[in-house]
């Protein structure tokens, strides 16, 4: 017997089956950076239409977590897809480098500034700490395969960026959006500083809920506001009853708020006459243990407006006022109002010119001049407040209530509202809020619900307190008059001079600046502001300090490109998306972005938030070290980012399985392109075998669908389409069918080269389509593809060598779709025969297809090549009417199938069973087509 193995076109490639990504990827990274891949991308795309995805800066503290990885991978996928769409899409990563968390870390090492270390030295230590954190995070981000300006990122602590933040503040002031006021802000007594909205978390807290009687200054005057419902108006002091869960704020009470249209009742309760909202009377009196009451009179809230009541323990008279926020859902319908400790209280207090009282120091302790409560921390003062109220017979009820309460996101401790002198961006000054709401309409929000979410937040947010009392932050570089508290009239011009100094020496330049340097003889009249900016102002103004300044964003016209997209987690509607919007509106009166894409949070396999305490944290470093970055990237792409993103070892292993299918498909393509040179061996479209033309056309459909999915940021659709194509169109159909032709046809024949041409087209398209997601693997494939090409796939564009089926094709796309169904039914019949031991494999079988006229016409079009599609040694088509009773029914209407074992001898080269085996004396073991493929011109294939 002869050995014909050497006559076969066996697959051969250096592309390994085992990916070994964890070991291979770091070497590929070295190659990318030693060959300046990112620089080559920029050079290749210079002058093209720009796409700017502006990076929201992560905080420079700690290792990156899985959420960071999701965010950076999503950005990288989108940018790489835009690059392949021939956009110039630079990516400048950034870091948020100022603020309290860094201060706290440095304090642990060197102590608080002003004690063991000077403020200047403390800032230097903070800068050094942040730089080390940036280096650590940058290393991990690069390991993810994310390409960008890693050697020149933007840092909010860069001297130039700090200077530009000051310039941004100057523009806000110039456009009249800044004001100073004593206003209640979220205040953390642990931080000793105001908190931004985004720095507040809500957790359950147990608080005293108390009902307090405020006696009327003039009983008769108050009674005259009511309409009697009985002949008797009762007896005893008249009191309005308030309900509060913050007893410690009662020293700052300056009013009782009522609802204008709500009905209030005057009720006799023992020796008192109490004013309570009618709908709440029964619940309140039950709470007081006095259910034997009678209603004496009623009135509306508006009837009691400006009536005076006595503060329960201070020598004060407080008015009844009207407020829209008063409801009768709980409490008494009479709301304790302390303008110094609540935003609603403050707002209504402005209308009634109420005092904004605050007796609480920065550390949460009542000041020494506070009557009754001096030296007590506010939360410890609650019990003392109850004692004072009880002594004055003003406490009607006290219970413990578990309720949602604001906490500091860093310390996880309860915070307070506290009026302090602060700097604010005024939401309703110069129509900032209204203009922002209008501009939101012009932005594309992905998912669409993001629009409504940010609209509600902008509608309801208070003025933005942008000042902080910290050491490590961009200073508010202002001088205010010592007597009038007014800004210096030349503030904007002076801020530019200060910014120039900061560009050279950093923010320390402000602290070192002697006022006389700028103010001259006026220095004695002005006070230098010592506050720093909220870090959300730092990051929120990067549209002005980075996008509007970096040369990478400069167009050939000399103009600066605006950001096309901001992409962050869903918490940033209240954070960076909003701070960026408000500062951009205040500076430029337009949104800083055209599109905003939001992704969900990462949860574990049980849908639980990841936390160290639960032991369910998934480290991206561990995933990369075990499975490789491409598996992590594939998981991100496969997950619908618009909701919570679930990850677990099991889920990542499923991603690894999907990856293996893609890799094996790619390996098959490369192995069967062995010996193929596209410059000499590429077969013209019209000369290709019909099946090959069809798969190229299917690849074009895939490419169009995938590009459309990339453009709509439907990355999980990209994943689904790619994996389906590799598994179904290729793996289960096309690649299965062509193995015979690929391996056995004459090497330089049209039948073989047509097949290789199709594989080449598929590989050229697939490698590009997968590149944004499977960046390392795509680069590995790219390096092994035949033909001249760019050094890296990322400098190219989508493949343009694909084509559609022509209108005069003998087998249309619909015909091939029908054939896939027929083949699936034949496979079922073959499997039954195998299980019954009637045949060993498909090539031992001869099939008879009993078909309706319509299906028969399709099948006979393939002539003798139908057997190659079905991967059997023989295939006959007969009329449906001739079908024997034992023919197998199928799910294809008008088709029955019979399978018999072939009696013909087996060809030792192609393994087909053919009658002509043994007829050639030189090659008695071979069938006729194998003889032709070895010694003749090679077999001719038209269809398959």
From Swiss-Prot:
GO terms for biological process: isoleucyl-tRNA aminoacylation. A motif ('KMSKS' region) lies at residues 609-613. InterPro entries: aa-tRNA-synth_I_CS, aa-tRNA-synth_Ia, Anticodon_Ile_BEm, Ile-tRNA-ligase, Ile-tRNA-ligase_type1, Ile-tRNA_ligase, M/V/L/I-tRNA-synth_anticd-bd, Rossmann-like_a/b/a_fold. GO terms for cellular component: cytosol. Zn(2+) binds at residues 907, 910, 927, 930. It catalyses: tRNA(Ile) + L-isoleucine + ATP = L-isoleucyl-tRNA(Ile) + AMP + diphosphate. ATP binds at residue 612. Keywords: Aminoacyl-tRNA synthetase, ATP-binding, Cytoplasm, Ligase, Metal-binding, Nucleotide-binding, Protein biosynthesis, Zinc. Transmembrane segments: none annotated. It holds the Pfam family tRNA-synt_1. Its main location: cytoplasm. Its EC number is 6.1.1.5. One of its GO terms (molecular function) is aminoacyl-tRNA deacylase activity. It is found in: Cytoplasm. SUPFAM superfamilies: Anticodon-binding domain of a subclass of class I aminoacyl-tRNA synthetases, Nucleotidylyl transferase, ValRS/IleRS/LeuRS editing domain. CDD domains: Anticodon_Ia_Ile_BEm (cd07960), IleRS_core (cd00818). Its cofactor is Zn(2+). A motif ('HIGH' region) lies at residues 58-68. Binds 1 zinc ion per subunit. IleRS has two distinct active sites: one for aminoacylation and one for editing. The misactivated valine is translocated from the active site to the editing site, which sterically excludes the correctly activated isoleucine. The single editing site contains two valyl binding pockets, one specific for each substrate (Val-AMP or Val-tRNA(Ile)). Monomer. HAMAP family: Ile_tRNA_synth_type1. Catalyzes the attachment of isoleucine to tRNA(Ile). As IleRS can inadvertently accommodate and process structurally similar amino acids such as valine, to avoid such errors it has two additional distinct tRNA(Ile)-dependent editing activities. One activity is designated as 'pretransfer' editing and involves the hydrolysis of activated Val-AMP. The other activity is designated 'posttransfer' editing and involves deacylation of mischarged Val-tRNA(Ile). Belongs to the class-I aminoacyl-tRNA synthetase family. IleS type 1 subfamily. NCBIfam families: ileS (TIGR00392). This is Isoleucine--tRNA ligase. The lineage of its organism: Bacteria, Pseudomonadati, Pseudomonadota, Gammaproteobacteria, Alteromonadales.
